[in-house]
Amino acid sequence: TAASSAFFPVPSADTSSRPGKLGNGPSSFSPLKPKSIPNGGLQVKASASAPPKINGSSVGLKSGGLKTHDDAPSAPPPRTFINQLPDWSMLLAAITTAFLAAEKQWMMLDRKPKRLDMLEDPFGLGRVVQDGLVFRQNFSIRSYEIGADRTASIETVMNHLQETALNHVKTAGLSNDGFGRTPEMYKRDLIWVVAKMQVMVNRYPTWGDTVEVNTWVAKSGKNGMRRDWLISDCNTGEILTRASSVWVMMNQKTRKLSKIPDEVRREIEPHFVDSAPVIEDDDRKLPKLDEKSADSIRKGLTPRWNDLDVNQHVNNAKYIGWILESTPPEVLETQELCSLTLEYRRECGRESVLESLTAVDPSGEGYGSQFQHLLRLEDGGEIVKGRTEWRPKNAGINGVVPSEESSPGDYS
């Protein structure tokens, strides 16, 4: 007890105590000494004030005793390196907030898209390559673009060809009205119309595949323009489809063919590529086809409003569907279209009623089938003449498309 009193000094005896009130205990402190009482309990002195003793000698304290915070303000702690540092909890919170914000921003900038076509083309509008002469656009095959055999339909392929052709003109800055006409063509009421189309399919993509379409234009004769396409698999680079077409100009008001004016030629010739066609021109003459020579006829075909394009005539891709209407069902079920040649004779309007005629081509060779087609008006006017070649389904790489590439150089 003597040792403890050295660490807990006691105030002077003149300080009065107020028993029973918290905070104002006795002014002096001494170890409690128990005293026996008759009932066996302990008796404690309430105001013991004896000075503490060490080794039998009394130890005195200064009269000032202990001072409380109410008596005098405490001196500020000395200025050291530690107590001048900022509040670490607040600093840590600020650093954490800044780090999380930076991480979120980085993730937004560095996010990697899942679709391959979005890596180079974030908005799906395509881009030009090889000094602006080749246009490239990627497409993902949707569920509504496949047929009963779970592969893309020929109409889907034709739509991709048309879409890239128009986007090419727009990206090159040659589209005045947003649909393929240059400014000089717009002034002269001229439009492009397709005269001939050849398509060769090596393999049809399936649902979920991503295809890359490359297209470019070249000169064709004195008053024509040739447009070629290559469609490949984005993952493997395999060439899926080759297509080539010839376009001529027509006056939108008179509906007559027109020569290419010099002003228009100066607009488009800088974009021409000096290259051979990706498909060798099929110059075989299409024989005459009528009701007597046809093996199958489908009548009463009429265009719907959705079949018309901005020039108020039937979309080119729609003709493919009408031609297939008269193809024998057993061919559609067991074979797939691998080659297509179409020659466009005249346009088809909204009020037209058409007939689709199909006949087996006797000159066909190979293990597949070949057919001749004619799409005509009820009065006999020819709209489209064509030839199709078919192969057994799932023939794949055994198709008619050659393995060598016929593109204008390295357009990567």
Swiss-Prot record:
Whether Membrane counts among this entry's keywords is no
Instruction: Please name the InterPro entries in this protein's record.
Output: Acyl-ACP-thioesterase_N, Acyl-ACP_TE_C, Acyl-ACP_thioesterase_NHD, FATA/B, HotDog_dom_sf
Any idea where this protein resides?
Plastid, Chloroplast
Identify the enzyme class: hydrolase
Query: In the UniProt annotation, what is the result of changing residue 347 to A/D/Q?
Result: Loss of thioesterase activity
Task: Please state the protein's primary subcellular location.
Answer: plastid
Give the E.C. number(s). Answer: 3.1.2.-
Listed disulfide bonds for this chain?
none
Q: What is the effect of changing residue 313 to A?
A: Loss of thioesterase activity
What are this entry's molecular-function GO terms? acyl carrier activity; fatty acyl-[ACP] hydrolase activity
Q: Which chemical reaction does it catalyze? A: tetradecanoyl-[ACP] + H2O = tetradecanoate + holo-[ACP] + H(+); hexadecanoyl-[ACP] + H2O = hexadecanoate + holo-[ACP] + H(+)
Which GO cellular component term is one of those annotated?
chloroplast
Keyword annotations from UniProtKB, A to Z: Chloroplast, Fatty acid biosynthesis, Fatty acid metabolism, Hydrolase, Lipid biosynthesis, Lipid metabolism, Plastid, Transit peptide
Q: Region labeled Disordered — which residues? A: 1-78
FT transit peptide:
1-46
Instruction: List all Low complexity biased stretches.
Output: 1-13, 56-66
Similarity comment text for this entry: Belongs to the acyl-ACP thioesterase family.
Question: What name does this protein carry?
Answer: Acyl-[acyl-carrier-protein] hydrolase FATB2, chloroplastic
Q: Which organism is it from?
A: Cuphea viscosissima
